[in-house]
C-alpha cells in the first residue's frame, strides 16, 4: 500500500530539517555525480524538491526507472550545503530511505523535454497534451484560468446575478456561423444543434421573470481557427439584465473586469470606469477599425484632397488615408516589412514617404508629391523628421488597410505605444443594417435582435442604412472581447426590423418561435453582453495564441489530435440515427 504524502514538493523549508517525510511526484531529472551519489529532482503539481541519493544500491534502483515515472520518496529533510534561493525549497533537500515506483513511464525517450515543451511542434504538444501540461509554465496558465473563472463567478454573484445553465441540445438557428448538428435517434431526419450562444434562452429567461442572469456558457461554432479564436467550442461570461439600459450593462462590465485584469494580468494597470465610448463610424474614421488598440496614440488623417491628381496611379479616384508618425527612426528594411505585412493581412498595398530634417520630401512615393510639398506639409501638419504611411481604395477598404498599418506602425514605435496596460473601450452606435458583400442586399449589420435607435418610427421613416442600433462591442488592446445589445423585446418592432431585410412575420415565427411567442406575452426591456472567457484569459496571461490557455484545445484544423477527433464511427451507430454518408467526389 502506498504511504500517503506528508508534504507537497513546494512545501518543505529549513525549519523542517530533521523531519521524516514522504513526498510523491514525477521523477523529472537526475544529475549523477558518481555511482553512489546523485541529485534527483522530484516534481508535483506544487513545485520541486531535490532528493539526494547517497547509496550505490539506491542509485542502481533509480537507474532502472525512466524519467517521468511517478515515485514515492520517504526520507529525512536536511539543510542544503549549496542553497538555491530562487526555489521555494532551495534551502533543503531530502535524503531518501526508500523510493517506490508508483507509475512507470515505459518509454526511454520522451516526445519532447517537459520543461522545453513550448518550443516543440504544436501538433506534438497537443497529441501529448498530458506531457505538455506537466511543464509548469504551461500548467500555470490553466491554474490561472481556474482562478479567473472563480473570480468572475464571485463578482457576478455579488452583483445579484443568478447562475442559470441553459440547454446544450437545442434547435438550429441562424446566428452567423455553421451549427454543429446532432441527429435525433428517436426522430428520424431531425437534428438537435449545439448552441452557438445561449442568446434566445437568456432572453426568454428575462421574459420569464428573472432579473439578472449569468453563466460561464459553452458555445459551439463550426468556424475556422485564428490566433484569438479556437475552433469548435469556447466559453463566454454570458449575462442578461431585465429592465436595463445600455449604460446599466456598461456599469456591470466596468465594475467586474478591470479588477480581475489588474489582479491576475501581466500588466497591473487597466482602464478605470467609465471606459471610453467611441461611435462605430468615428472609430473607423480615426482608427481604421472597430477594434482599436488605444495603447497606440496614432490616428488616421484624410489625405484624399491633397493627394488628388498627384499622378500616382493607386491614388487616382480613391480615398487616401494617412498616418503621421513623428520620431519614427525605423530602417528601410523594417518599413518594407511593415508594408509587406499590410498586404498579407489586407490584400491591399501601403505606401510611405518622409519629411527629412531639411524639410524635404524623401523616400517612398515622394517624387509624386514634390510639386505640392507645401500643401502636403500643411494638410498633414508635418514637421521635419515625420514619417507618413498611406493607404488608398474605396473608403471602407482604405480605412481598414490604414487600421492594419496603424497597428503595425504603433508596435514598431515605442514612443507611440504603451504596452504595459489594458486599455478598454466601448464601440457604440453600430449601423442596424448594411449591404451584404456577397448578396448585395440589405442585411443586419450585427445582431438581428438589437433594438433600433428611434424604435419603430425610425424603421418606418428613415433610410435603413442610416438607422443606428443600441449595439455595442467591448474592446481591449485591439481585441474584441464581446458584442452586446439592448434587445428588441417588442414583437411589432421585431417584425418591422425583419421586414426590411425581406423576412415577414411568418418567417420570424418560424425561425424564432419560442422567443417571439414569449415576447407576445409581455417582455421587459432587457440588455446583455457576453465577454469571451478564453480571449480575456489570453489577454490577462499575455499570450498571443488562445490555445495556450485552453486545457485541451483543438489544432488549427479543428482536430483533437490527442483523442483522435473527429473520427469515423461504426456503421451500426449511423444506422441507429438513420444517417448515410455521402462522400464528396474526389477532384
Task: Cite the ranges covered by each PLM segment.
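Class II aminoacyl-tRNA synthetase catalytic cores and aaRS-like
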Residues: 1-587
Amino acid at each position: 500500500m502506498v504511504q500517503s504524502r506528508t508534504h507537497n514538493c513546494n512545501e518543505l523549508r529549513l525549519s523542517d530539517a530533521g523531519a521524516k517525510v514522504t513526498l510523491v511526484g514525477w521523477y523529472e531529472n537526475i544529475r549523477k555525480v558518481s555511482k553512489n551519489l546523485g541529485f534527483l529532482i522530484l516534481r508535483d503539481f506544487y513545485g520541486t524538491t531535490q532528493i539526494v541519493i547517497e547509496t550505490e544500491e539506491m542509485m542502481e534502483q533509480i537507474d532502472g526507472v525512466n524519467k517521468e515515472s511517478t515515485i514515492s520518496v520517504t526520507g529525512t529533510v536536511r539543510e542544503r550545503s549549496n542553497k538555491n534561493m530562487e526555489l521555494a525549497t532551495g534551502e533543503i533537500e531530502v535524503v531518501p530511505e526508500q523510493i517506490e515506483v508508483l507509475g512507470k513511464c515505459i518509454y526511454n525517450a520522451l516526445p519532447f523535454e517537459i520543461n522545453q515543451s513550448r518550443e516543440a511542434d504544436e501538433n506534438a504538444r497537443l497529441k501529448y497534451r498530458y506531457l505538455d501540461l506537466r511543464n509548469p509554465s504551461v500548467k500555470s496558465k490553466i491554474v490561472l484560468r481556474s482562478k479567473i473563472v472563480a473570480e468572475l463567478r464571485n463578482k457576478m454573484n455579488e452583483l445579484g446575478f443568478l447562475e442559470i445553465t441553459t440547454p446544450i441540445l437545442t434547435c438550429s438557428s441562424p446566428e452567423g456561423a455553421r451549427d454543429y448538428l446532432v441527429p435525433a435517434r428517436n426522430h428520424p431526419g431531425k437534428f438537435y444543434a449545439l448552441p452557438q450562444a445561449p442568446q434566445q434562452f437568456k432572453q426568454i429567461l428575462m421574459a420569464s421573470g428573472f432579473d439578472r442572469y449569468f453563466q460561464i456558457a459553452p458555445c459551439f461554432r463550426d468556424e475556422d481557427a485564428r490566433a484569438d479564436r479556437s475552433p469548435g467550442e469556447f466559453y463566454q461570461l454570458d449575462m442578461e439584465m431585465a429592465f436595463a439600459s445600455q449604460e446599466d450593462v456598461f456599469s456591470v462590465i466596468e465594475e467586474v473586469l478591470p479588477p480581475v485584469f489588474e489582479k491576475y494580468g501581466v500588466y497591473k494597470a487597466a482602464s478605470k470606469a467609465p471606459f471610453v465610448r467611441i461611435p462605430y463610424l468615428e472609430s473607423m474614421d480615426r482608427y481604421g477599425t472597430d477594434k482599436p488598440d488605444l495603447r497606440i496614440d496614432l490616428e488616421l488623417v484624410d489625405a484624399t484632397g491633397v493627394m488628388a491628381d498627384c499622378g500616382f496611379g493607386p491614388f487616382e479616384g480613391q480615398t487616401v488615408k494617412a498616418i503621421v508618425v513623428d520620431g519614427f527612426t525605423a530602417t528601410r528594411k523594417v518599413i518594407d516589412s511593415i508594408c509587406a505585412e499590410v498586404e498579407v493581412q489586407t490584400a491591399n498595398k501601403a505606401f510611405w514617404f518622409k519629411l527629412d530634417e531639411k524639410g524635404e520630401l524623401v523616400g517612398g512615393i515622394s517624387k509624386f508629391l514634390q510639386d505640392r510639398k507645401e500643401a502636403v506639409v500643411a494638410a498633414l501638419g508635418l514637421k521635419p523628421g515625420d514619417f507618413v504611411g498611406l493607404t488608398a481604395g474605396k473608403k471602407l477598404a482604405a480605412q481598414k488597410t490604414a487600421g492594419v498599418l496603424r497597428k503595425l506602425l504603433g508596435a514598431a514605435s515605442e514612443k507611440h505605444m504603451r504596452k504595459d496596460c489594458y486599455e478598454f473601450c466601448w464601440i457604440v452606435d453600430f449601423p442596424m443594417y448594411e449591404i451584404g458583400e456577397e448578396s448585395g442586399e440589405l442585411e443586419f449589420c450585427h445582431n438581428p435582435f438589437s433594438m433600433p435607435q428611434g424604435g419603430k418610427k425610425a424603421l418606418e421613416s428613415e433610410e435603413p442604412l442610416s438607422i443606428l442600433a443600441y449595439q455595442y462591442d467591448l474592446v481591449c488592446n485591439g481585441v474584441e472581447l464581446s458584442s452586446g445589445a439592448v434587445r428588441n423585446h417588442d414583437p411589432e418592432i421585431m417584425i418591422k426590423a425583419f421586414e426590411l431585410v425581406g423576412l415577414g412575420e411568418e418567417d420570424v415565427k418560424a425561425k424564432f418561435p419560442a422567443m417571439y411567442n414569449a415576447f407576445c406575452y409581455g417582455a421587459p426591456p432587457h440588455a446583455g453582453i457576453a465577454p469571451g472567457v478564453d480571449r480575456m484569459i489570453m489577454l490577462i496571461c499575455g499570450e498571443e495564441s488562445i490555445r495556450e490557455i485552453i486545457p485541451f484545445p483543438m489544432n488549427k484544423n479543428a482536430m483533437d489530435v490527442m483523442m483522435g477527433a473527429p473520427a469515423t464511427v461504426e456503421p451500426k451507430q449511423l444506422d441507429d440515427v438513420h444517417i448515410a454518408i455521402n462522400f464528396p467526389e474526389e477532384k
